[in-house]
């Protein structure tokens, strides 16, 4: 049997942020020492109770101190990000962790976050997240020339490339073709 730790993480709103982050780090290091197989870290922008707005950045601080545990985003709220940037950051983290990433993505469930990022309704956020995920997978599996013309995202990478010099190639994850992906659904 494998054990995992899912933490958003939640703290009392009055707890100082540096203290909350230190406690979260301690919990994950302990989970690694106890043999937990994975840890899931949430992402929220507008709450003092769940103060991790950048889970990949937070998890990167633990790579050496928690050398065995797999790190999972629980979740990256894709409608609040540019999926090209997320694809590059995910690939970089997966490389730094030697393939210990599980990518959790979702539409965003905290209503104050949704308001901050344009107050789109859940069905539209689902469509944005799924299109963004499709785009990320395309970026991980292909090199220029690339074109995407979707409902929410429109880009090309074909005119200003120099593939023989590596210009026009996006970062690829350590795990091929890409890290395991988990989709969060909110009802």
Segments and roles (model prediction):
Residues 1-71, 178-179:
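N-terminal beta1-alpha1-beta2 module of alpha/beta enzyme domains
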Residues 8-10, 44, 76-78, 106-110, ...:
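Active-site beta-loop-alpha junctions enriched in small/polar residues
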Residues 11-15, 77, 116, 120:
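Short coil/turn segments at secondary-structure junctions
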Residues 20, 48, 56, 79, ...:
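Flexible domain-boundary/linker segments
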Residues 24-27, 57-59, 68, 74, ...:
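Short, flexible coil/linker segments at or flanking structured domains
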Residues 82-187:
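Internal, glycine-rich beta/alpha segment that forms the wall or movable "lid"
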């Amino acid at each position: 049997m494998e054990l995992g730790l899912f933490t958003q993480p939640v703290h009392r709103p009055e707890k100082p942020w540096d203290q909350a982050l230190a406690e979260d780090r301690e919990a994950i290091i302990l989970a690694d020492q106890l043999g937990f197989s994975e840890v899931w870290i949430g992402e929220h922008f507008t709450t003092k109770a769940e103060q991790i707005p950048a889970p990949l950045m937070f998890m990167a601080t633990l790579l050496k101190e928690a050398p065995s545990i797999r790190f999972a985003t629980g979740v990256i709220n894709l409608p609040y990000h540019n999926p090209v940037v997320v694809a590059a950051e995910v690939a970089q983290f997966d490389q730094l962790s030697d393939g210990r990433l599980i990518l959790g993505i979702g539409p965003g469930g905290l209503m104050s976050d949704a308001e901050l990022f344009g107050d789109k309704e859940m069905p539209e956020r689902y469509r944005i997240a799924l299109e963004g995920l499709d785009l990320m997978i395309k970026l991980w599996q292909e090199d220029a020339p690339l074109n995407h013309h979707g409902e929410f995202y429109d880009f090309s990478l074909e005119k200003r490339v120099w593939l023989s010099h590596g210009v026009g190639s996006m970062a690829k994850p350590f795990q091929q073709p890409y890290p395991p992906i988990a989709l969060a659904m909110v009802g």
